[in-house]
Amino acid sequence: MFFHKKRDVHGLLLLDKPQGISSNNALQKVKMLFSAKKAGYIGTLDPLATGMLPICFGECSKFSHYLMESNKKYHVIAKLGEKTSTSDSDGIIIKKRPILINSFKIKSALKELTGLIEQIPPMYSAIKHNGVPLYKYARQGLNIKRSIRKVLIHDISSIHQEKNLIEFKIFCSKGTYVRTLVEDLGEKLGCGAHVIFLRRLEMASYLHSQLVTISYLHKLLRKEKNNNFNFFEKIDNLLMPIDSPVSFLPKVYLFPQQSYNFQLGQTVIFFSDIKNSLVRVIALENNKFIGLGRINTEELLIPYRLVSRSIN
């Protein structure tokens, strides 16, 4: 199975990343199972974290940055009274304090962390300094000055606290570091805190129910060995369309000659009520997505980002 020739695979897989492996490790496992030539993930999850890790195959990667800009939802459990070197349970405990809190103090602290807030990215992160990820400096005991970032915490809900644990769900903008938010919460409560459980539930408009596990892919592989069915055909059916990351954009349809010219990178005349907007361009002859275009005020459709003609 793993000696198959690499394939041209195109589409989006919503992977349910398991705990204990890096996002890149999860990507490589899935890429190998699909025997895919090209694939990349969107939105790094720490080894501790589980949940939604979108993987873009082939031409889908051209549109992946739209997902990078999207909001995300997480389920978080934090342990109070202990601050760690990594702000999660993978690190070592560097400070312990008594937990002297009540429900009012918790709600007040979380309210302060809702809305537009400032965060300093943690040293244990993939952000690069002089081309080197910060976590590599951190492992050497170095502390690099990081710029303050503004992030938007839309909502913190389903709050539950019992003994030294606090649980909640957070809906936030791109670039939010949940570990940093939990550490800041611990400081506001005066006892310290770190993440012991983190799961990404949603990203953009994708739902938790759409996730696919690595174990399920292996189950299909074992089934192929025991039964006569096409493994690749089965797993390719799990992929979402190439234009899935831009599904929020309106569609426009082109006739064959228009479609041909558009795919050559030529501007085409197009009458529409849509003005000054990006649109998904669909070829009428086969109903396939051929790229993104922008309709200007002069009723012209200008190519913006094209799907390779070789797959249409």
Curated annotation (Swiss-Prot):
Disulfide bonds: none
Binding positions (substrate): 74, 177, 198
Keywords: Isomerase, tRNA processing
SUPFAM superfamilies (UniProt xref): Pseudouridine synthase, PUA domain-like
Record-annotated active site: 46
Biological process, per Gene Ontology: mRNA pseudouridine synthesis; tRNA pseudouridine synthesis
GO molecular function: RNA binding; tRNA pseudouridine(55) synthase activity
InterPro entries linked: PsdUridine_synth_cat_dom_sf, PsdUridine_synth_N, PUA-like_sf, PUA_sf, tRNA_psdUridine_synth_TruB, tRNA_sdUridine_synth_fam1_C, TruB_C
Pfam families linked: TruB-C_2, TruB_C_2, TruB_N
The protein's Enzyme Commission number: 5.4.99.25
Catalytic activities: uridine(55) in tRNA = pseudouridine(55) in tRNA
Family: Belongs to the pseudouridine synthase TruB family. Type 1 subfamily.
HAMAP family: TruB_bact
Role description: Responsible for synthesis of pseudouridine from uracil-55 in the psi GC loop of transfer RNAs.
Protein name per the record: tRNA pseudouridine synthase B
Organism: Buchnera aphidicola subsp. Acyrthosiphon pisum (strain APS)
Organism ancestry: Bacteria, Pseudomonadati, Pseudomonadota, Gammaproteobacteria, Enterobacterales
